[in-house]
Amino acid sequence: MNYITTPLEDHVANMYYKIGISEPDSSIEEIARRLGIVLLYRKKPSFSMEGVITLNPFTSKEVRKITFAHELYHTLYHVGTQIDMPHLFRQLQEWQATNFAYHFCVPTFMLQKLKLPAYRSEAITFIAETFCVTNQFAKERLTIYEKQIIGTLFHERLSSSKELPG
């Protein structure tokens, strides 16, 4: 099977390659530094604005990484404040940032290098520990990855069909 990457997966891989990171062991501080993002820790809800990401230091390192990736998307790709935006547009931006976080925290190009355990529960724990994310986040990311594999297999099967049923 030739895994078909999505544009987001390609974009995340290119981001990491441009900053010289190819393994999952880099800290968010190092990633922020290489991206030119200022990272601050304050005892308040996390947010981002104009190249600065503020994280709550009292959350777990796994939650901070997930939040960092979510806020990174807002910093890089969204402008202005969400306060005056229509509700549906704000929801769209939040969905985009969350989807990006799944791929940024557990990049496909790094995930593909791993030999995942045969049992799904063990694979989830392995992903969570390898990429420093929560088990729930790893479970959802694995589901996203599996759906892309299924889509690739479906595409290959359709492409190999001699004729379409009529």
Q: Which residue stretches match the model-derived regions?
A:
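Active-site hotspot residues in diverse enzymes, especially metal/ion-binding acidic/histidine motifs
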Residues: 1-166
